[in-house]
């Protein structure tokens, strides 16, 4: 597991080495576990406070290429 970004010192965007398809990241912390698709940029599973989710989705969109590159290294 690799923490890629922190939001408000309570939440983390994580890329997990041993994870299932499709490519995605997890938004975790403060009782939240949301899966965000790297292919579509939308929430696959879970819920989070609106402002936190908006910030996470914007960060994932801005870093999508590098996240997908790392995902593909871990999941050849």
Describe every region a protein language model picked out.
Residues 14-48:
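A short, structured beta-strand/loop element
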Residues 2, 10-13:
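Charge-dense, helix-prone N-terminal extensions
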Residues 5-8, 58-59:
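Hydrophobic N-terminal alpha-helices or hydrophobic patches in metabolic proteins across all domains
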Residues 3-6, 25-27:
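Short, solvent-exposed secondary-structure boundary motifs
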Residues 1-2, 76:
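Intrinsically disordered, low-complexity and often Lys/Arg-enriched segments
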């Amino acid at each position: 597991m690799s923490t890629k970004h922190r939001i408000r010192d309570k939440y983390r965007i994580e890329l997990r080495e041993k994870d299932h398809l499709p490519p995605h990241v997890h938004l975790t912390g403060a009782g939240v576990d949301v899966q965000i698709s790297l292919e579509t940029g939308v929430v696959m599973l879970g819920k989070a406070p609106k402002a936190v989710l908006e910030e996470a989705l914007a960060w994932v969109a801005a870093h999508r290429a590098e996240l997908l590159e790392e995902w593909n290294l871990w999941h050849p």
